């Protein structure tokens, strides 16, 4: 796949981390999550691990429309930010976004199924560099990169205050 603004470099997941292909990730975020989880007002995205990346198939509903027939850029940015956040978690890092760059390459229509992928590119101390994209078929609609700051494992309570994290391989 040819990228325009991102590298596509994917950091290996430590085998001892407990995270494996096929694991569904929605349960680790609180019910208040805007993008994933079981909040009825959310996008209800269902991300899982696939080939060292966080992956989801998703059709943006009409309620996420910006321009006529197109997904609002803020919605696309939120989806990518959330997915990149999940990508830090599968490396056992609990982090927050420090910098987010989104490149809108071609319009993203509502009511069409897309693949959304996110991954960690590099970890440098507390800085975690991530990349993500939204694509249909082999066309990339949106590319994104971000820098997250690792808050440390004690931040688990912030991300999942009502979950027993020991049950989800952390």
Label each PLM-derived region with a short phrase.
Residues 151-159:
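A short, polar/charged loop-to-alpha-helix boundary motif
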Residues 128-129, 137-144, 149-152:
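C-terminal binding/interaction regions
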Residues 168-170:
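Conserved small/polar residues in nucleotide/adenosyl-binding loops
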Residues 82-115:
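Hydrophobic beta-strand-centered segment that forms part of the acyl-chain substrate-binding groove
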Residues 48-53, 63, 70-95:
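Active-site helix/loop of acyl-thioester processing domains in fatty-acid/polyketide metabolism
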């Amino acid at each position: 796949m040819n990228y325009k603004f991102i590298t596509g470099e994917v950091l290996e997941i430590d085998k001892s981390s407990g995270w494996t292909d096929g694991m569904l990730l929605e349960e680790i975020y609180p019910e208040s999550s805007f993008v994933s989880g079981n909040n009825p007002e959310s996008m209800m995205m269902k991300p899982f691990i696939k080939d060292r990346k966080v992956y989801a198939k998703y059709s943006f509903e009409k309620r996420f429309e910006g321009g006529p027939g197109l997904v609002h850029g803020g919605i696309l940015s939120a989806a990518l930010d959330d997915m990149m956040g999940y990508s830090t978690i599968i490396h056992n890092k609990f982090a927050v976004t420090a910098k987010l760059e989104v490149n809108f390459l071609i319009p993203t229509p509502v009511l069409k199924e897309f693949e959304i992928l996110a991954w960690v590119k590099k970890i440098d101390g507390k800085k975690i560099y991530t990349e993500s994209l939204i694509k249909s078929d082999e066309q990339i609609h949106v590319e994104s990169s971000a820098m997250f700051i690792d808050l440390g494992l004690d931040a688990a309570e912030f991300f999942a205050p009502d979950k027993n994290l020991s049950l989800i391989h952390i």
